[in-house]
Regions:
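C-terminal scaffold of the Radical SAM
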Residues: 1-166
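Alpha-helix C-terminal capping/helix-coil junction sites
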Residues: 66, 180-183
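Short amphipathic alpha-helical interaction segments
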Residues: 165-181
Length: 184
């Protein structure tokens, strides 16, 4: 996690270099995010790096990791060749995954579900989901797109066309044209 209280770019670089020196094969990087419902939202830590510094940390991580033969395969994940997380890729490819344990989430048969966060409740009814939602075809399509955008390779339009029986470029022509017109 980067963007910690009082963390400077040089501190983050040193931490990253130390991690690399351990001969790791995979690393996930996440910027510190303080949720509005947590203790720190009401009592914020002092000296958090600003957004620009956090962006610099992220960009520096990409530079350092790629220089050390890590592939940036997903927005927050880097791996040496053949060490990409199969679990992560399964998730970002919007495939089935099962949630086992307290507060675990899963996705099966077009249904998202999560288990109770209460340990006693989960132990007494481990197969009963706390909540579930059957996704509509449109919701499934939207999830396929936004999850795919997390991967550096992006989305596979041909796969989406087959899976959802659509013409992606036709269906989203107006949105695509809008963003093309921005000329980033």
């Amino acid at each position: 996690i980067y963007g910690l209280p009082e963390q400077k770019l040089s501190d983050f670089e040193n931490d990253l270099e130390k991690a690399i020196s351990l001969n790791i094969q995979h690393i996930s990087l996440y910027g510190l995010k303080i949720d509005e419902d947590c203790y720190f939202a009401k009592n914020p830590p002092k000296n958090l790096p600003n957004e620009d510094t956090q962006a610099d940390m992220y960009l520096k991580a990409i530079e350092i990791l790629e220089k050390n033969n890590f592939t940036h395969y997903e927005i927050s994940n880097f791996a040496k060749q053949d060490y990409e997380s199969k679990h992560n890729l399964n998730y970002w490819d919007n495939n089935t995954y099962y949630g086992f344990g307290v507060a675990a989430h899963g996705y099966e048969n077009e249904t998202r579900y999560f288990n109770s966060a209460n340990l006693d409740e989960y132990i007494n009814k481990p197969l009963q989901h706390k909540s579930s939602q059957k996704l509509t075809k449109q919701e499934q399509l939207e999830e396929e797109i936004f999850l795919g955008f997390r991967k550096m390779e992006g989305i596979n339009i041909e796969k989406i066309n087959k899976k959802f029986n659509i013409d992606f470029l036709k269906k989203y022509a107006n949105i695509i044209d809008k963003y093309i017109s921005y000329k980033y």
